[in-house]
UniProtKB/Swiss-Prot annotation:
This is Succinyl-diaminopimelate desuccinylase. The keyword Magnesium does not apply. Binds 2 Zn(2+) or Co(2+) ions per subunit. PROSITE patterns: ARGE_DAPE_CPG2_1 (PS00758). It comes from Haemophilus influenzae (strain 86-028NP). The gene is dapE.
Length: 377
């Protein structure tokens, strides 16, 4: 299986699919799946290409989810080999997207192919949801496919997202949930004036200082058995004209919360508004909710992937919910059990992104055994 996975991964990496461009990756995948009897449905939205492919018509519906888009390479001169050449050096496959996530995407596809070849009349449905809009805006990708499927009352029972979840060794971590993410863009009004005449102006930085102290020290919750406590970080602050003798007219503050299931986005918005009113600030705030938290509790999917990893590698993975957001947050809206598993994430988005070809082969075996555990038991 390893040779098949690596070969497909190389084919995908050689296509420079900087988000939201697909560069023909999904066409390669669709042609392979169509030969095995998968129903292929294209779902393009604006500049994003999405693929929904499925084999079978009954439940349970087991979906593999992934993305063909990648982040920019950075300075290509710093790479040890061209980032889209997909070279193998000392057992490592190099290239942008090798770990995030064309390698695991290839492993999922080969696993599905091998299972269908051996079980053409399998029970349930095997599906693949693939997008070219995960790394950037994430507006016309998985979320639009999910909305389309929900409008048609289509179900996903279990979903494996191939994000690189492993930390130090393949299979040491699977993600069974993610924190929510919400960003506040806050504008605090002042009155511009000369710094020598502060009584004729109103400095929004000075006015906001007590509020910022409260905002950054407030304990939102204590977390729970599945999630760490909610955290807030200020990402950007800007005020002033650049001159040292002008009191600014406005202060801009951008902050982000990664929040757990102990709070909601509405609770966060309400509490921030209460703080702003308490400190008597003139303000305008715009909120951007990137995703709500989701959690897959121990059950059939988590048991199946855990067992597959144990059988293949001999280690028991730890289920975690840390890290950033993923497209799993959208699929969870369908009521599906969602788990993420993939190769090591130590080089993702970096120069010389790479993945072990041995690990890619093991990923394929693990995904295949997961299918066996879910459909043959």
């Amino acid at each position: 299986m390893r040779e098949k996975v690596v070969s497909l991964a190389q084919d995908l990496i050689r296509r420079p699919s900087i988000s939201p461009n697909d560069e023909g990756c999904q066409q390669i995948i669709a042609e392979r799946l169509e030969k095995l009897g998968f129903q292929i449905e294209w779902m393009p939205f604006n500049d994003t290409l999405n693929l929904w492919a499925k084999h079978g018509t009954s439940e349970p519906v087991i979906a593999f989810a992934g993305h063909t888009d990648v982040v920019p390479t950075g300075d290509e001169n710093q790479w040890s080999s061209p980032p889209f050449s997909a070279e193998i050096i000392d057992g490592m496959l190099y290239g942008r997207g090798a770990a995030d996530m064309k390698g695991s995407l290839a492993a999922m596809i080969v696993a599905a192919e091998e299972y269908v070849k051996a079980n053409p009349n399998h029970k349930g449905t095997i599906a693949l949801l693939i997008t070219s809009d995960e790394e950037a805006a994430a507006k016309d990708g998985t979320i639009r496919v999910v909305e389309t499927l929900m409008a048609r009352d289509e179900k996903i029972t279990y979903c494996m997202v191939g994000e690189p979840s492993s930390a130090k060794n393949l299979g040491d971590v699977v993600k069974n949930g993610r924190r929510g993410s919400i960003t506040g863009n806050l504008y605090i009004k002042g009155i511009q004036g000369h710094v020598a005449y502060p009584h004729l102006a109103e400095n929004p930085i000075h006015k906001a200082a007590p509020f910022l102290q409260e905002l950054t020290t407030y304990q939102w919750d204590k977390g729970n058995e599945f999630f760490p406590p909610t955290s807030l970080q200020i990402a950007n602050i800007h005020a002033g004209t650049g001159s040292n003798n002008v009191i600014p007219a406005e202060l801009y503050i951008q902050f982000n919360l990664r929040y757990c299931t102990e709070v909601t986005d509405e609770i966060i918005k309400q509490k921030v508004a209460e703080m702003l009113e308490k400190h008597n600030l003139k303000y305008r705030i715009e909120w951007n909710l990137s995703g709500k938290p989701f959690l897959t509790k121990p059950g059939k999917l988590l048991d199946s992937i855990t067992s597959a990893i144990e059988e293949t590698i001999g280690i028991t993975p730890k289920a975690e919910t840390g890290g950033g957001t993923s497209d799993g947050r959208f699929i969870a809206l369908m009521g599906a059990e969602v788990v993420e598993f993939g190769p090591l994430n130590s080089t993702i988005h970096k120069v010389n992104e790479c993945v072990s070809i041995e690990d890619l082969g093991k990923c394929g075996e693990i995904y295949h055994k997961m299918l066996v555990n879910l459909l043959d038991s």
